[in-house]
């Protein structure tokens, strides 16, 4: 009997170990499901609230602490999640969704700081290209106010902001296994064409809700095309805002999209990003406006995304 019990305990222990190893393996690389989906992401929760509230057949999956919601949005199979704020989170979790779900297209929705002086708070931009403005050389000061790149560094082509000289980033992809240097990552032409078909969409001028009192001074508009830039900084500086507009011809500046776009490029997955202006990145007359206009901006971005999915074929 004692021998039988020992053997039984050994078998149970081996079974438990096998299950544990199997679970660990599954968590290391399995696909959650095989349904082709559009991945929809935002940086933090309030940006995703409206979209989650309209998702049908919603089912949650937690991977590496990130909650993914599968379901249908405007009749399209989707997986929605929060990337987290800033570049590393955006890159890491964009790759995670590509690894664990059958993602056919990537869509980012959220807020941004306005850089183009021709745009207003509440406007929604859909840039054609995104670049990383903080991929930089911090050059030595060779004389007062003058910062000189080393002679061997031949990829410093853009104007500098003080000691900061923007540079392209090295990237590999399935189509270019040898590292290439790129500054701009281009949104998918077919997705941009779909966005152009909803360009006359009426956006909200006032915050929704019975207690809402916040309204914009100008009717917001949807702007397709142009450029956006991203980096690991919350920008609230008029001088840098002016530099970003003149140097990159940027409409908006944020903290995630260029990293997301780079991962999309590396994986050869089409992408588009909708960014609504919540503030002017330091260009306003008073304190930064994000606290006042965040909700209008986030809801307008989500409204455009919903219209885009309705139009998407």
Language-model segments: what does each one mean?
Residues 11-12, 47, 191:
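Alpha-helical structural motif
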Residues 7-8, 46, 278:
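Residue-level micro-sites within transmembrane alpha helices that shape
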Residues 28-38, 62-313:
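Glycine-rich phosphate- or other oxyanion-binding loops that anchor nucleotides, phosphorylated ligands
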Residues 24-26:
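Boundary at the C-terminal end of the N-terminal hydrophobic targeting segment
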Residues 9-22:
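Bacterial N-terminal signal peptides
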Residues 1-11:
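Bacterial N-terminal signal peptides that target proteins for export
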Residues 36-64:
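N-terminal targeting signals for Sec/Tat export/insertion, comprising classic cleavable signal peptides
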């Amino acid at each position: 009997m004692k021998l039988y019990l020992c053997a039984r305990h050994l078998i149970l222990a081996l079974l438990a170990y096998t299950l544990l190893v199997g679970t660990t393996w599954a968590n290391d690389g399995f696909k959650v499901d095989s349904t082709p989906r559009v991945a929809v992401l935002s940086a933090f929760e309030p940006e995703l609230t409206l979209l989650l509230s309209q998702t049908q057949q919603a089912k949650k999956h937690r991977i590496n602490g990130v909650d993914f919601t599968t379901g249908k949005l405007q009749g399209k199979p989707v997986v929605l999640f929060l990337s987290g704020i800033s570049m590393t989170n955006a890159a890491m979790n964009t790759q995670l969704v590509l690894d664990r779900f059958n993602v056919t297209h990537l869509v980012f929705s959220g807020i941004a700081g306005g850089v183009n002086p021709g745009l207003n708070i509440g406007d929604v931009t859909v840039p054609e290209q995104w670049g990383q403005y903080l991929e930089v050389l911090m050059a030595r000061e060779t004389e007062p106010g003058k910062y000189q790149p080393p002679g061997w560094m031949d990829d410093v082509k853009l104007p500098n902001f003080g000691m900061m000289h923007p540079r392209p980033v090295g990237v590999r992809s399935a189509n270019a296994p040898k590292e290439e240097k790129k500054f701009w990552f281009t949104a998918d032409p077919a997705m941009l064409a779909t966005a152009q078909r909803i360009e006359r969409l009426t956006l909200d001028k006032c915050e929704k809700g019975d207690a809402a009192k916040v309204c914009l001074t100008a009717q917001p508009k949807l702007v397709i095309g142009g450029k956006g830039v991203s980096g690991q900084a919350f920008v609230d500086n008029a001088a840098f805002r002016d530099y970003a507009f003149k140097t990159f011809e940027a409409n908006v500046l944020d903290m995630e999209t260029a990293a997301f776009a780079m991962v999309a490029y590396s994986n050869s997955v089409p992408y588009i990003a909708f960014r609504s202006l919540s503030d002017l990145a330091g260009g306003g007359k008073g304190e930064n406006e994000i606290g006042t206009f965040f909700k209008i901006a986030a809801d307008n971005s989500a409204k455009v995304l919903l219209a885009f999915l309705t139009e998407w074929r």
